């Protein structure tokens, strides 16, 4: 069994927090992009569309690598059942809390903003269910995927650990070329599966729960397992934390290919399959770019960084309805896209931090939005002398 490192990986904590917080400018820029969303500005901005595409092209791939890294670290720390329980509680409880407190009010607001409240009674039972699946899971989808991955990895991590006990891990060698070929094949495999489903029964691809539980899990699971392997094999981790011009150049070229596919691809043709292949290898190369950058600049501890690491999940959870509120009721009154974008950042981040500070002072909310039980200090229990 691998020993759990005593020193905390500060740069990975920081990267994970920044990737979470990048969801704020991502969704605000989505309002001002050429992509159709719940709410959009009158005229799209080319540069904010480019900025939005850049974040979207790699953010969650890198996030799931870090999640897999820390998940395997905890897998070695706890017994199997306790590990599953702890991991599911820490992502499942915040997700279940956010549905009635955040995404349900958000859904009701959007029904009136988009003028769909009157047509709701006329929808079929399945359409109501599917609409609620998309709208109530909403930006919480990655938490649902983490619950599914954690459950799958009860078996996968056991197999990995058993294989390690029967082999010499020091002889395992990794190269970015080999990994690139593997992830290219994984991307092609995912594209084949999606195209097959599209041919056999296309309506299932528009089913919200199928999309989240099956398709998203299928795409991001290789990154989650890659993170676990990076924890196990120091050579693999060093491969990601060492700057590589090849990875940077390859990522830049892949991003250009991603943009071209967005611009000229067609959803009725091969756009989504092509995107899955591109983003699979782009995500791998961006792990090197982000890890090496973060290892060089973010590998330290500070009170400010710790604050945002702890606050990142809560801020991400509450930012989405705040962003949609801003887009629906404030964006129409700001003529400049860039000014609207900056005002949106100030509005959303400011209110999110205020709400975070309020929730810290309410033990029940603190538990519900973190999944961590409130631990009382021994000093609090000791009688006064």
UniProtKB/Swiss-Prot annotation:
Q: How does it sit in the membrane?
A: Multi-pass membrane protein
Q: Does the keyword Transport apply?
A: no
Arranged from A to Z, the UniProt key words for this protein are: Acyltransferase, Cell membrane, Membrane, Transferase, Transmembrane, Transmembrane helix
List the signal peptide residues. none
Q: Which GO terms describe its molecular function?
A: acyltransferase activity, transferring groups other than amino-acyl groups; transferase activity, transferring one-carbon groups
Q: What class of enzyme is it?
A: transferase
Copy the pathway line from the protein's UniProt record: Glycan metabolism; osmoregulated periplasmic glucan (OPG) biosynthesis
Enzyme Commission identifier(s): 2.1.-.-
Q: Where is the protein localized?
A: Cell membrane
Ranges that cross the membrane = 17-37, 60-80, 91-111, 137-157, 173-193, 212-232, 239-259, 274-294, 311-331, 338-358
State any GO BP term from the record: glucan biosynthetic process
The GO cellular component terms are: plasma membrane
Alphabetized Pfam families for the sequence:
Acyl_transf_3 (PF01757)
User: What NCBIfam families does the record tag this protein with?
Assistant: PRK03854.1
HAMAP family assigned: MdoC_OpgC
* Family listed: Belongs to the acyltransferase 3 family. OpgC subfamily.
Q: What does this protein do?
A: Necessary for the succinyl substitution of periplasmic glucans. Could catalyze the transfer of succinyl residues from the cytoplasmic side of the membrane to the nascent glucan backbones on the periplasmic side of the membrane.
Protein name as catalogued: Glucans biosynthesis protein C
Upper lineage: Bacteria, Pseudomonadati, Pseudomonadota, Gammaproteobacteria, Enterobacterales
